[in-house]
Amino acid sequence: MSYQRVEIPESDIQRQLDICAQLRAHFSAGGRQPLAMVDTYGCQQNEADSEKLRGYLRAMGFDFTQDEFAADVVVMNTCAVREHAETRVFGNVGALTHTKARNPEQIIAVCGCMAQQEHVAEKLKKSYRIVDLVFGPHELWRFPELLRSVCTEHRRVFAIDPADGSVAEGIPQQRDGSVKAWLSIMYGCNNFCTYCIVPYVRGRERSRHPEEIVREARELVAAGYKDITLLGQNVDSYGRDLDEDVDFADLIRSINAIPGDFVIRFMSSHPKDATEKLFRAMAECEKCAHQMHLPVQSGNDRVLHAMNRGYTREKYLAQVALARQYMPDLVLTTDIIVGFPGETDAEFQDTLSLVVTVPGVMMRMMSRSTSPLASAGSSSCSQMATL
């Protein structure tokens, strides 16, 4: 699959900020404080995206509320990884019918990974007439422009860019807390695990330039943040799409060199891409937490191959052993999928035995959800292993 990296020009982001100023005048015309509600579903990357949505809304003059009846603008930032999250979103969107009836001027927006799917956008268009704005992750940087179209043209707006995505710097952020901070270092994924929808909705991997990341980290430390989590679907792939000679271990060392009292964390790593260089950097950088999320998904080689994970059971165990050589106190967490299509009881027992083999690992276990975009989504799970 061909891919061309797209970086949004600074002038385009400035244009969005200029639109924010226009919308500030629009929403304050009634003489009262406008209120917005941003409801976030799913992963930490979605939480980081919601901080940008709130940053834009703050630039438009909004304060924030958790009362949907009081909100002038409601934004649902959605997740498409698991079926349960989609069901919740549709239920909650439907419940907003009552708020829209009470306040017909209320603007309802649905964005995020779920909105990027064509069948979801079509369902929202046909069956949820109360929704005014739908846009995917690739269009987040254009949120002010899209919202202005709803306000001034009095029409529903659907902006689903099928491109692989872009990198946009300079979007304002309204962070959730004052101690812990998310710091996105890259977007998208190139792995195409057969159970996963992320590459289809988030696009291919795009790394931010290291100087932009270090600049943001410095600003966070200066603002008093003590716990900085570096975010990427696969942080171990960081830098591969850049012209610069930099990888994730180099980035950790650069952030570690920032003066101040703070902790560096990151998520998530991929067993096929984590390197000894990374483990060494984690061990040698005093600000880097000895903590790693290393999803195994299965302990059986045939199932791992069917998942397109790119490693074997033996490779995973070797990675864990090497990491613990450098960091005996390593806190390891992992993900396990139970009931992957075609998984037998014997193959499931291989996963159980791996759990016993890796002492001290903390696990998240889930039953697989179907997805119309992931290639395993059309398979039926006739054999469901049980714990």
Language-model segments: which ranges?
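Conserved SAM/AdoMet-binding glycine-rich loop
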Residues: 108-110, 117-119, 222-348
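Structured C-terminal cores of nucleic-acid metabolism proteins
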Residues: 344-364, 368, 387
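Proteins enriched for Cys/Gly/acidic motifs involved in redox and nucleic-acid/cofactor modification
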Residues: 1-238, 277, 292, 314-322, ...
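Proline-centered flexible-loop/turn and helix-kink motifs
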Residues: 101-104, 129-130, 260, 286, ...
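Low-acidity, Ser/Thr- and Arg-rich intrinsically disordered low-complexity segments
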Residues: 367-371, 375-382, 386
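Detector for intrinsically disordered, low-structure N-terminal pre-sequences
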Residues: 72, 156, 245, 337, ...
